[in-house]
């Protein structure tokens, strides 16, 4: 009788420990998934900030460099394309193809802005325009924020992806419908060093 009680207590203790451990693993995965979503919202927030700055920047530059219409068209098209994918639902984090489309549109917009800013160097009157200088500083700060938020997103996505691939997280991830989150990568042109001429 005493042995049966000890064995029953032992199994009950093991079942309780397994239950507590399962709850802990489940809660950890939920928390990491929420952190990824929250960090993704910060990335979107900074892209939206850049998106909102562009019309003011373009209109300021247009005043001084009105004949650069092709460049303005490129910036407007890149902005429209980026705006079309900026508010994709959270499922973008589950679909690597949509994520790549989002990143490509944002990289294209960033490239168009860089071309716009490099063209402005040909117009000395812009260098004295306080509104332009303030917008340029704000855009530069926004680009830095985007870079920071992308890195933070990649960090938390890496932590999440590691947890759902390791045991015992892998057992829960499938049942919870959790998939690996995609990472931001460098733009294709970033792997080629720019040519510097003196």
Which positions does each model-derived feature cover?
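A helix-centric hydrophobic-segment signal that preferentially recognizes long
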Residues: 2-198
């Amino acid at each position: 009788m005493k042995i049966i009680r000890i064995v029953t207590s032992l199994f009950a203790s093991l079942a309780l420990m397994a239950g507590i451990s399962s709850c802990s693993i489940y809660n950890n995965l939920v928390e990491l998934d929420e952190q990824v979503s929250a960090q993704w919202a910060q990335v979107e927030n900074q892209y939206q900030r850049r998106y909102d700055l562009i019309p003011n920047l373009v209109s300021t530059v247009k005043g001084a460099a009105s004949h650069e219409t092709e460049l303005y068209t490129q910036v407007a098209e890149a902005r429209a394309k980026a705006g079309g994918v900026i508010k994709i639902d959270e499922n973008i984090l589950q679909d690597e193809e949509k994520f790549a489309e989002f990143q490509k549109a944002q990289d294209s917009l960033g490239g168009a802005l860089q071309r716009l800013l490099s063209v402005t160097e040909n117009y000395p009157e812009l260098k004295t325009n306080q509104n332009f200088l303030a917008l340029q500083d704000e855009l530069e700060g926004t680009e830095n924020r985007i870079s920071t938020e992308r890195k933070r997103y990649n960090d938390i996505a890496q932590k999440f992806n590691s947890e759902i691939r390791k045991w015992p997280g892998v057992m829960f991830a499938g049942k919870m419908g959790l998939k690996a989150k995609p990472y931001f990568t460098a733009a294709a042109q970033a792997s080629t060093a720019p040519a510097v001429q003196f």
